[in-house]
Amino acid sequence: MDTTEQIALIGAGPSGLAGARCLQKHGVAFQGFEAHDDVGGLWNIHNPRSTVYESAHLISSKRMTEFAEFPMADSVADYPSHRELLDYFRAFADHFGLRQHYRFGTRVQKVEPVSQAPDTRWRLTTEGPDGARHTAEYKGVVVANGTLAEPNMPTFPGQYAGELLHTSAYKSAALFEGKRVLIVGAGNSGCDIAVDAVHRARRVDISVRRGYYFVPKYVFGRPADTLGGKIRLPAWLKQRVDATILRWFSGDPVRMGFPKPEYRMYESHPVVNSLILHHIGHGDVKVRADIERLDGHTVRFKDGSAADYDLILAATGYRLHYPFLAPECLNWQGMAPSLYLNIFAPGFDRLAVLGMVEASGLGWQGRYEQAELVARYFKGLDSGSAPALALKAAKAGPPPDLSGGYRYLKLERMAYYVNKDAYRQAVRQAAARFA
């Protein structure tokens, strides 16, 4: 097939596979590209760009995360490991015959519009497994290369004589054997890895600059994210009610040494981990203040304390990274692209991003619904349908409010955060217009 009649789809992780399935389902011709030799993206630990580690599991339950049309087996754990998830994505790809649409081992080097017209074609330069470069033009582009691969590595004043790594380099707790370890950041990965370190390290401390809300994985013997949600509460009331319930189950993290959060619940992504509080309570992990400076093996903290470490592991998150596209194509505004519904580039008809969205409880089905909308829109553009033309006009205008009434922290990792309910409603309503 002539490539100018195809959509180029970049990535075969969860969002990329969702895109492939929906384009396939709606009869939109496409060519997929995946730099690795297999599907799974982040969840394929063998992928050089994967940042998962040996002990990694979902922090949301399988029933709140899976693709609705392809449920995980009952035999799969409530919170599956990366191994189970890779099996799941392989099975998903095989069940729907998606592999045949991909060129594996092929890295996209550059994506550029042929012109600045909204309906422009797109020129892709790729590098195959043999190192040969190839350039072709496509009708449109769907970017689904993930959001958790490019480390956000901080810099600290002073000089450090020990080992300084980002969690993206962490794979196994063997790294900690006999070492004095400082983990910087207490997000979900930081807390998971601190728990890993307890069993191998000589000492484990965790440095934080703000407080957190800690959500247990199980409540009354059931995955916590499967409870509640049937009654829609205003944001202010849900924050108050859920924070109270959390204190009943998890206690007050301030008593464990964490700062009191300077924000209300859900204004930043909660930490789904109660084991970290268990180990702090048992003296296995010590909470430290923010870092002031490094001095040899000594770390000096902003509360005036100091301690020596052999290894500092920065659990400081990731940056959005679309190196093959000029920032202006994606309408970058500050810390992230400004896209309509976190999907559509306002200046181009057929440039979309899947997976550039974060929300507590959105799951892969939320990304699938993004892909469903993209497939319907692209198909509608081909026929000039009224819903497609209406969406084309809407995405060039002011974006809808997707906050659900929450005041999210102005942090880089929150730059593309939305409220799950507000977001899914907006995406579903947009897709329903094509029915």
Regions from the language model: what does each represent?
Residues 2-55, 71-212, 216-218, 231-387, ...:
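Flavin (primarily FAD) cofactor-binding/catalytic cores of flavoenzymes
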Residues 57-61:
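Flexible "cap/lid" subdomain of the alpha/beta-hydrolase fold that forms the substrate-access gate
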Residues 64-65:
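Active-site segment of extracytoplasmic enzymes that catalyze sulfate/phosphate-ester chemistry
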